Amino acid sequence: IEAIVNETGQTGFHFVDEAAPPKALKALADELISRQLPISWWGNIRFEKTFSPELCQLLADSGCIAMSGGLEVASDRLLTLMKKGVTVEQVARVTKGFSDAGILVHAYLMYGFPTQTVQDTVDALEYVRQLFENGCIQSGFFHRFSCTVHSPVGLDPAAYGIELIPLPPDTIAKNDNGYIYTSGED
């Protein structure tokens, strides 16, 4: 980081990791603070319970200005089905800790997850509205569920009431498998 700052003058860093571990971010923050490196940085995380208010403040003190994380669906039932390892209450607590420390929070959200009902979606929208209202998140983006072959859904589609549509044999990327509902839902 020091070499890049010295060579380019750039002081803004986006650390690209879909789920940067809290322990690694703490080590980064401690090192940035000990070296007195005046940078701004942001990254991507899971809203893990180990992101305490104290850790969020330490990250802010080290120059962290924003975090993005996957809330996906604001439903404990669906989060469990997705095997996300977080709860809605935990996400609210962690996002509030980041926001209280002055770190902007962006939430990735989805709709159309297998077994997700219209009511689940309406409830999720209301919960997200409350997260905005209470200053827990500052931005969010909804996207339609996409099935990847190595996700829990892609590995066991029948457990989610879907059947994967076979990909053409010459397909390189397997990031968006088509599927049909076997349960009659859509």
At which residue positions do the language-model features occur?
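Secondary-structure boundary elements
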Residues: 100, 133-134
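Hydrophobic, well-ordered secondary-structure elements that form the walls
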Residues: 69, 107, 128, 140
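An active-site-proximal structural segment forming one wall of the substrate-binding cleft
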Residues: 4-5, 130-132
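Flexible glycine/acidic-rich beta-alpha junction loops that bind and position SAM and/or redox cofactors
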Residues: 25, 77, 81-82, 111-119, ...
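Catalytic cores of alpha/beta
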Residues: 55-56, 115-130
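Conserved SAM/AdoMet-binding glycine-rich loop
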Residues: 1-104, 113
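C-terminal structural cap/anchor segments
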Residues: 98, 105, 110, 124-127
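Acidic/polar loop patches that form or flank catalytic/metal-binding clefts of enzymes
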Residues: 11, 40, 106, 135-142
